[in-house]
Design a protein with these regions (language model features):
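Polybasic, lysine-rich low-complexity intrinsically disordered segments
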Residues: 3-4
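Short, Lys/Arg-enriched N-terminal segments with co-localized hydrophobic residues
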Residues: 18-30
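A well-structured
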Residues: 30-190, 519, 523
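C-terminal, non-catalytic "cap/extension" segments appended to globular domains
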Residues: 33, 52-55, 65, 69, ...
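Contiguous, non-catalytic segments that form substrate-binding/exosite surfaces or channel walls
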Residues: 131-282
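Active-site recognition of the HExxH zinc-binding catalytic motif
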Residues: 284-300, 321-325
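Post-HExxH zinc-binding segment in Zn-dependent metallohydrolases
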Residues: 313-353
């Protein structure tokens, strides 16, 4: 009897000890604030996944009649995501996590999670919802208003977007001690300031206009054959898909579609890129695909073990644009790559003997410099002028120095000053041409020229250890992508932009590489 009781007592004690161990283990896990934050971050990432795919659907395949209901749904989703990012307990978790022992990757993850949390918590939920609704309404209407050069109709919707964006900029400025525009820049280019951009762009303005004029004069005596005829959209798409294969795009985790404004969306495991086709020529859509494939390869190459956390995301939009412009400008317009494009284009359009598809002619088409109205169709040399114009306008708009109604006139003045073109009465090819401002993405435009500068710097560094031209000529670009993966893609947001660039190239941003690249390509 005593034995039974002792045995029974032992079993009970063992069960209690086991239970205590499990409870203590669970408590230890639950008390690990960093793990809580990572789990919560992945939850937010899943909803952002849905938002991104739905955004692609809206731009690429949604019928026009679905716009109003879609706007409501996306606004509701935005509010939900904002609610997740601003839950009260997160402040305590961040405070606790900062006292925990974390490795270098975990420290970077915590830093980036906290940065995004701080950016989200300053905005009231009502403003987030209002911005989503106003942005969706403005963007959808813009698609037809731009075609009709309807500034008056566009201005009515855009007024609300600008007002709400200015409110956001002011709130962020008060929370961070920055100027309103600097506070918006922080969303796209962490650590970059207006002062830095003013300095870099002011320098560009001292040499770019004269370089453009010299190159245009130099090319005036060169003959080339412009594409003429009919280039079916389905053939252009097939050509684009072949070029994407050459660039080693992962079709198991992405696809190509068509939209009014080319873009790269989706998520790293499901990247969606789009282009637009003009059946009277093939040049623009093809290089647009090369550009967006650069964005896509960066997304597909981000560190998978950090997926769902901010540290596993792209470092900045400038670095993102550096990858698309590396593909488009550094690789895509090189003589070795043009040879591949010429051969593939001739095959897909059944015109191998057409002089349009001769390598030297395609090379001239893709390095032709001319002053034009449209940013997305601009050549490599005039593109920075388009960006600087937009930067100066959005900077003054967010800082309250100008009104949104001033924009058409200011646009015309700056286009005349920088490119010698007037957009007076031609707003569809002026201030209405871009999608960015329709949803309040103020602060994004500088990323394009920063990206071009980073791309030139990356290429200069890469050529020290990689036979770039040899790899392109061979048709196996793996050595190029291996360098990008090792130095850029796999790093995600583990380092600041300056640290990332310095690790890859030995120095922080140096615009002289960009200037040297342009001089080498267009003056030699």
């Amino acid at each position: 009897m005593m034995k039974k009781r002792a045995s029974h007592h032992l079993v009970i004690c063992t069960l209690i000890d086991t239970l205590r161990f499990r409870l203590s283990s669970r408590k230890a896990i639950s008390m690990n604030a960093f793990n809580k934050l990572v789990k919560h971050s992945k939850k937010i990432s899943n909803f952002n996944h849905l938002s991104s795919i739905v955004g692609w659907d809206q731009a690429a395949v949604m019928p026009s009649g679905g716009a109003e209901a879609r706007s409501q749904a996306m606004a509701e989703l935005s509010v939900h995501i904002h609610g997740l990012m601003t839950q009260p307990q997160l402040a305590d978790w961040f405070a606790e996590a900062e006292s925990e022992t974390l490795n270098i990757e975990q420290q970077a993850t915590l830093r980036e999670m906290k940065r995004q949390w701080q950016q989200a918590t300053v905005l009231p939920e009502a403003l987030v919802e209002a911005q989503s609704l106003a942005g969706s309404k403005c963007e959808h209407a813009w698609r037809s208003q731009r075609k009709n050069n309807d500034w008056a109709g566009f201005e009515k919707n855009w007024a609300e977007v600008v007002t709400l964006s200015q409110e956001e900029a002011q709130i962020r400025a008060e929370a961070t001690g920055k100027t309103p525009y600097d506070a918006m820049l922080e969303l796209y280019e962490p650590g970059t300031t207006t002062e830095q951009l003013n300095r870099v762009f002011s320098d560009v303005k001292t040499w770019l206009p004269s370089l453009i004029d010299v190159v245009i004069e130099k090319q005036s005596s060169e003959s080339f054959i412009a594409p003429k005829g009919h280039y079916p959209a389905e053939s252009q798409k097939a050509l684009g898909l072949d070029v994407m294969k050459l660039l080693q795009f992962d079709f198991n985790h992405g696809r190509l579609d068509e939209s009014v404004h080319p873009f790269c969306g989706g998520v790293p495991s499901d990247v969606r890129i789009t282009t637009r086709y003009n059946e009277s020529e093939f040049v623009q859509s093809l290089m647009g695909i090369v550009h967006e494939t650069g964005h896509a390869r960066y997304e597909q190459g981000l560190p998978k073990h950090l997926a769902g956390t901010p540290a596993g995301e792209a470092r900045s939009m400038g670095i993102h644009e550096s990858q698309s412009l590396f593909f488009e400008m550094q690789v895509g317009r090189s003589p070795a790559f043009i040879a591949h494009l010429a051969e593939l284009a001739g095959k897909h359009f059944s015109a191998m003997n057409d002089p349009v598809f001769r390598v030297e002619n395609i090379q001239k088409l893709y390095t032709r410099v001319q002053k034009d109205f449209i940013r997305v169709d601009a050549d490599e040399l005039t593109y920075p002028a388009h960006v600087i114009l937009r930067f100066e306008i959005e900077r003054d708009l967010m800082n309250g120095k100008i009104k949104h109604t001033d924009v058409p006139e200011l646009w015309d003045q700056k286009m005349q000053a920088y490119l010698g073109l007037s957009t007076k009465g031609n707003d569809q090819n002026g201030c209405m041409q871009d999608i960015h401002w329709t949803d309040g993405s103020f602060g994004y435009f500088p990323s394009y020229t920063l990206g071009a500068m980073y791309a030139a710097q990356f290429m200069a560094a890469m050529k020290k250890t990689v036979d770039v031209d040899g790899a392109i000529r061979s048709g196996d670009l793996s050595p190029i992508f291996s360098w990008l993966s090792e130095n850029i893609w796999s790093k995600g947001s583990l380092f600041s932009t300056d640290e990332l660039v310095k690790q890859a190239t030995g120095e922080t941003l140096n615009p002289e590489h960009f200037k040297a690249h342009l001089s080498q390509r267009y003056l030699k």
